[in-house]
Amino acid sequence: MREHCVTSESVTEGHPDKVCDQISDGILDACVAQDPASRVAVETLVSGNIAVIAGEITTTAQIDAERTARAVIKAIGYDDPALGFDSDSCFILTNLRTQSPDINLGVSRGDELGAGDQGVFYGYACDETANLMPIPIALAHTLSLRLTMMRRDGTLPWLRPDGKVQVTMRYGRDGRPCGLDSVVVSAQHDEAVDRDTLVRGLVEGVIYPELHDWLQPGTRVLINPTGRFVVGGPAGDTGVTGRKLMVDTYGGCAQHGGGAFSGKDATKVDRTAAYMARYAAKNVVAAGLAGRCQLALAYAIGQIDPEMISVETFGTETVDGDRICAAVREVFPWTVSGMIAALELRQPRFRKTAAYGHFGREDQGFQWEKTDRSGELLALCTR
């Protein structure tokens, strides 16, 4: 293998696309909190001081989508009219209908649920980090989350909600990360802060505390490369739900089937199958059966079982690959109902996933981040 670089990005919760993801998942949570069997597919668009919420909801829950959206916007930090987008004054248009009866015909299958759509879905894990995520996206999320923490706790009071981070990692001939090539931090800021204060604050308060083990003399550090980032969030860019797929998953280090997650209830295999694929792949790596694992699933709308389960270990497997695939098929449930139950997806906690990645978040208690099936996998593969 030749030496190469891998680049991944993360964004803060105030990024316009992430504002939309959080509004969509906030509405989903509001429905699921009252009616765990809610069918939800909600999309959000923000532009200027306007938010548009549209989609399909079938539920017994009584929710106020506009009120939920305003609460999410305020919690993110858009609570000041000076930002050009704020929770109190923004205009919100809603267009929510019930789920198509044709889709419901395929999903509601008596005791079992059929898949809410067709598609291929991927899960990935590798041994580069303690949480079994690729290190470029892991570091990028760490930096973007720290940007938000420094804003929220007042350490860097001139920070504003929007921000982006990009990390480029060098990999050696052995395929292992060997150095940090560059890091880019673009942080929205108050107009009054001078550049020296901004650069010093971001280097000392954000970059160095998280990357000191990786920083080298040759590492390039770029901070607000345009020189100014005052206008940000929806005031600066239009945001749409589901437009940060690589941020949500593995930073481009694994394949992606193209389906977004946020705003979709658990019958939507775009979300549930991707979570289950991560769960299985992570347990394969945690069991020591492979250093890298990518699991692919395919479903057809209305069908209970997957059309395909495929396991790729990229030559890093420690036992025969066919045995790993057979064990994965046996240990994990692959029906739609089985995945929902195993992953505890009838609970209102989807908004937690909507910023800083859906994977690698071990502090959030997500079932798909647990490695509780690794022992069973190992036993099946080595007996």
UniProtKB/Swiss-Prot annotation:
Positions of ATP binding: 15, 162-164, 228-229, 237, 243-244, 260, 264
Record keywords, A-Z: ATP-binding, Cytoplasm, Magnesium, Metal-binding, Nucleotide-binding, One-carbon metabolism, Potassium, Transferase
CDD domains per the UniProt record, alphabetical: S-AdoMet_synt
Binding note for cofactor: Binds 2 divalent ions per subunit.
InterPro entries the UniProt entry points to: ADOMET_SYNTHASE_CS, S-AdoMet_synt_C, S-AdoMet_synt_central, S-AdoMet_synt_N, S-AdoMet_synthetase, S-AdoMet_synthetase_sfam
SUPFAM superfamilies: S-adenosylmethionine synthetase
Cofactor: Mg(2+); K(+)
Reaction(s) this enzyme catalyzes, per UniProt: L-methionine + ATP + H2O = S-adenosyl-L-methionine + phosphate + diphosphate
Subcellular localization, as worded in the UniProt entry: Cytoplasm
An individual GO BP term: one-carbon metabolic process
GO MF, one example: methionine adenosyltransferase activity
Signal peptide boundaries: none
Residues at which Mg(2+) binds: 17
Residues binding K(+): 43
EC number: 2.5.1.6
Main location: cytoplasm
Top EC class for this record: transferase
UniProt pathway: Amino-acid biosynthesis; S-adenosyl-L-methionine biosynthesis; S-adenosyl-L-methionine from L-methionine: step 1/1
Positions of the UniProt region annotated as Flexible loop: 99-109
NCBIfam families: metK (TIGR01034)
Subunit composition and interactions: Homotetramer; dimer of dimers.
Name of protein: S-adenosylmethionine synthase 1
Taxonomic lineage: Bacteria, Pseudomonadati, Pseudomonadota, Alphaproteobacteria, Hyphomicrobiales
Primary gene name: metK1
